[in-house]
From Swiss-Prot:
GO cellular component, one term: cytosol
Subunit structure: Homodimer.
Family to which the UniProt record says this protein belongs: Belongs to the dethiobiotin synthetase family.
Protein name as it appears in the record: ATP-dependent dethiobiotin synthetase BioD 2
Function summary: Catalyzes a mechanistically unusual reaction, the ATP-dependent insertion of CO2 between the N7 and N8 nitrogen atoms of 7,8-diaminopelargonic acid (DAPA, also called 7,8-diammoniononanoate) to form a ureido ring.
Protein's gene: bioD2
The reaction(s) this protein catalyses: (7R,8S)-7,8-diammoniononanoate + CO2 + ATP = (4R,5S)-dethiobiotin + ADP + phosphate + 3 H(+)
Cofactor(s) the protein requires to work: Mg(2+)
Pathway named in the protein's UniProt entry: Cofactor biosynthesis; biotin biosynthesis; biotin from 7,8-diaminononanoate: step 1/2
UniProt cross-references to NCBIfam families, sorted A to Z: bioD (TIGR00347)
Amino acid sequence: MLKRFFITGTDTSVGKTVVSRALLQALASSGKSVAGYKPVAKGSKETAEGMRNKDALVLQSVSSLELPYEAINPIALSEEESSVAHSCPINYTLLSNGLASLSDKVDHVVVEGTGGWRSLMNDLRPLSEWVVQEQLPVLMVVGIQEGCINHALLTAQAVANDGLPLIGWVANRINPGLAHYAEIIDVLGKKLPAPLIGELPYLPRAEQRELGQYIRLSMLGSVLAVDRIMA
């Protein structure tokens, strides 16, 4: 059984967190135990409990087990620390150990990335290098907006060039007024080398909703049944 997935996006703010939430909820509804994992979270805020990131808290809220925050988000960076101009080395061993620990506890771990596939960490390395090291299959979130076809095709090509399998994509309608939505979905369906596994409509406060019904796990049926996928 394939245990771990990495969620990337065509850009920043395209809905990786709400899609991760939807996938976690869909898997949980199918009877699986799940955990969300946000290895590096930028723009975190200081709280009485320590540094916290709103996206990581969403993942924590839909995980099957009651896990400490640090198990969901081992590296929480403040707004200042998130800048590539701020030298803050990333402990990739810590990220790997955290992922391994979660993988031992649940059936599936949904790993949410930071920014897009080539978004740089503070050490000027993309998180995708760690994803390649961990050999995680990739699900892509496409924020449906002007220019998203180009961004989606470039992201899919970059994932393939890195030797990882793109096992599916999710359309997230982030612009309710966008014309030609259906045509964009049709073109992406024809051009992307992976199946469309879900469409999320535009929903206010989506991070607080039940979203599992928008994910078609049947499109991942054969993928979920194997231990590893080759690109």
